[in-house]
Amino acid sequence: MANPIKIGIGGPVGAGKTQLIEKVVKRLSKEMSIGVITNDIYTKEDEKILVNSGVLPESRIIGVETGGCPHTAIREDASMNFAAIDELLERHDDIELIFIESGGDNLAATFSPELVDFSIYIIDVAQGEKIPRKGGQGMIKSDFFVINKTDLAPYVGASLEQMAEDTKVFRDKRPFTFTNLKTDEGLDEVIDWIKRDTLLKGLS
C-alpha cells in the first residue's frame, strides 16, 4: 500500500481553498496519482464542487461531514480524516499525494502533524489588509501561505505591499505568494513549492 504525502489546505470560508485544490490537482494529476479529502460541517458541498469540476474521478474524492467545530476534525480528533485516508488507499493503492481541505475556519486553525506532512494556509484580500498583521497560527505555522484574490485589492483599499511586509514579519523566511486563482496568477509558485519542498522533485 502507498505511503502518500499529505498536504493540508486551511483557511477561512470563501478564501479559495477548494479552487486552489482544483487548480493544483488539474496540473499535478497529469504527473502523479492524487486523492482529495474535503471537510465540511454539515454537507459535502466542497466534495461536489470538485467532483463536478472533473479534475479527478469521483472515487478519488471523499467528503467528510465533521459537525461542530471544523478545526477539531483536523487537529484534536482527526479520526474521521484518518478513516477517509484509509478508504482512499483501499480504493486506489497507487495514490502518491493526498490533499486534505479543512472546513472554513478562523485564523488560529492548524493541522495535526500526525494528519498531514505539510500545510498550506490561504486567505483572501477581501478580508482586509490587516489580516496578515493579526498573525494567526494558521498563517504563522503553515509551510506555505497564500494571499488570494489580488484583483480585489483596489476595491477594498488593501495595499498588497503592506500585506507582504506584515507577512514577512510573522513568517520570517517561510515562503508565501499572492494569487488570483481566477486567472491562475501565482499558481506556478504554489505548484513549484509543492514539487520542490514536499515531493522533492528537481533536487539532485
Swiss-Prot record:
Q: Which GO terms describe its biological process?
A: urea catabolic process
Q: Which GO terms describe its molecular function?
A: GTP binding; GTPase activity; nickel cation binding
Say where the protein is mainly found.
cytoplasm
Disulfide cysteine pairs (residue numbers): none
Origin superkingdom:
Bacteria
Keywords of this protein's UniProt record, alphabetized?
Chaperone, Cytoplasm, GTP-binding, Nickel insertion, Nucleotide-binding
InterPro entries per UniProt: CobW/HypB/UreG_nucleotide-bd, P-loop_NTPase, UreG
Query: Mind telling me which GO cellular component terms the entry cites?
Result: cytoplasm
Listed CDD domains: UreG
One Pfam family of this chain: cobW
Where does it live in the cell?
Answer: Cytoplasm
- Residues the entry annotates as binding GTP: 11-18
Indicate the family of this protein: Belongs to the SIMIBI class G3E GTPase family. UreG subfamily.
| Protein task | Facilitates the functional incorporation of the urease nickel metallocenter. This process requires GTP hydrolysis, probably effectuated by UreG.
Subunit description: Homodimer. UreD, UreF and UreG form a complex that acts as a GTP-hydrolysis-dependent molecular chaperone, activating the urease apoprotein by helping to assemble the nickel containing metallocenter of UreC. The UreE protein probably delivers the nickel.
State the protein's name. Urease accessory protein UreG
Q: Which organism is it from?
A: Staphylococcus aureus (strain bovine RF122 / ET3-1)
- Gene symbol here is ureG
